[in-house]
Amino acid sequence: MSDIDQLNSSLLAEIAAANDEAALEAVRVSALGKKGSVSELLKTLGSMTPEERQTRGAAINALKNAVTDAVAERRSVLKVAAVNARLKAETVDVSLPVRSSPAERGRIHPISQIVDEITAIFADMGFSIAEGPDIETDYYNFTALNFPEGHPAREMHDTFFFNPDENGERKVLRTHTSPVQVRTMEAQQPPIRIIIPGKTYRQDSDATHSPMFHQVEGLVIDKKANVANIRWVLEEFCKTFFEVDSVTMRFRPSFFPFTEPSFEVDIQCDRSGPIVKFGEGTDWMEILGCGMVHPNVLRYGGLDPDEYQGFAWGMGLDRIAMLKYGMPDLRDFFNADVRWMTHYGFRPLDMPTLFGGLSA
């Protein structure tokens, strides 16, 4: 084997053994640098005879090309290996649950989740959100909603009253979110399409009642609103909220001072197991009350009942949360028990949408 062949074998072996780009560069310099072994051989070409250049000169040039190609190929392999090693070391599994991150271990309270779900549903129908004060006057909480003097709801045992002010007027913790309906009618002209989620207060406390609880009410005012519209809106809401393909509902005549006619709405369900299933079964469960807005309430809101009419409905957010997600005791909602929140709460980034799923 000639000295050129030996050098070729030696250099190719060193190139193949280089484990990183620094080692490879050292081999390249030792072969092709100014004082490299291949460069030294190239310097001898000038002193060769024409015959030697055809044989030995060609072999030296072939050696140079072989070393150059081998270095380039090895460099490419090392770059790919380096990238793969970095990816392996720095990979973040985006499929891991959010709760694995310390910053994301909190939970969204079921009531906040329910409000977001209901907002998503009614926003898709063209409704906006209205809000009002928790501390109300007797006028907005009772009088403007057609509660007559002497109505049981005005009694101390049912409502939280503040001490009378210097004018003898007593304010109350609102017993429903309905005062916002009157305030909205006073503030804007029809058509009106709003939902009103918020806190309400009544003197009641047991497994299914709390002195402070949450309601959502809806109000539609225009010139042609009717009972058929109520049925459609509530049926679409129930199907979407309980995430079922269809629901069977029944409207039972009832009485509320602020609506006429008034209805209690039941939804068909299956109560044979530990969890209530909607969209199937032969049982019935009351979920909300509704009706056509009473003409007197329209008048208190500054609207002419001969020109405008509307419908309204209301339901307890805490109760429908219990029905949908299976919480057994309403009082647990307000105990700030981290274990309960971990079990029933929702991940912070799982915002409910109609497209992505309400409770996904």
Swiss-Prot record:
In its keyword annotation, does this UniProt entry include tRNA-binding?
no
Q: Give the EC class as a word.
A: ligase
- EC number per UniProt: 6.1.1.20
Q: Which cofactor does it need?
A: Mg(2+)
Its GO CC terms are: cytoplasm
Where is this gene product found? Cytoplasm
BP GO annotations:
phenylalanyl-tRNA aminoacylation
Q: Which PANTHER family match?
A: PHENYLALANINE--TRNA LIGASE, MITOCHONDRIAL (PTHR11538:SF41), PHENYLALANYL-TRNA SYNTHETASE (PTHR11538)
Known partners and oligomeric status: Tetramer of two alpha and two beta subunits.
Q: What's the protein name?
A: Phenylalanine--tRNA ligase alpha subunit
Natural source organism: Rhizobium etli (strain ATCC 51251 / DSM 11541 / JCM 21823 / NBRC 15573 / CFN 42)
